[in-house]
């Protein structure tokens, strides 16, 4: 499965009323300035996960990226 843009992920989210948004993993990744650095990268396929996208977040240590998933649970 590849990481897709948040826009495409939200389209998938709206298509499935029973879907939810969860963190794909608990890791934090250094932010590289644009989501384009993450889209297209391959992540392990997990049953029930429809899509994975990168989201920018920020805390007192600075910006970071976290991977979010659209799941059917």
Show where each model-derived region lies:
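N-terminal acidic leader/helix
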Residues: 3-20
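Acidic, low-complexity, intrinsically disordered interaction modules
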Residues: 16-73
